[in-house]
Amino acid sequence: METLVSSIFWTLAPWKNMLLLKHGRIEILDQNTMYGWYELPKQEFLNSKQPVQIFTTKKYWILFRIGPERRRKAGMPTGVYYIEFTR
């Protein structure tokens, strides 16, 4: 089972439903768009002392790491960290 490595720092507060990401690129899957992604420049992460707020939502999301086999199958770069959101 894969785990989130230290280069990714996230907090999902169920009472605020806010995702905070410290480093990496995320892929967002939801029932409306089924696809979306957001990426911040590496330097912005290095200069930031606080996690970066990516988005807020009224829904509660559970985070999973997308494994390397699935990334290769989908044509995603393997050197970038992706996070999949499901309900």
Swiss-Prot record:
Subcellular location: Plastid, Chloroplast
Top-level taxon: Eukaryota
Annotated GO CC locations: chloroplast
Keyword Chloroplast attached: yes
Main subcellular location of this protein, as a coarse class: plastid
Pfam families registered for this protein in UniProt: Ycf15
Keywords, alphabetical: Chloroplast, Plastid
InterPro entries cross-referenced by the UniProt entry: Uncharacterised_Ycf15 (IPR019645)
Family named by the database record: Belongs to the ycf15 family.
Full protein name: Putative uncharacterized protein ycf15
Species whose genome carries this gene: Solanum tuberosum
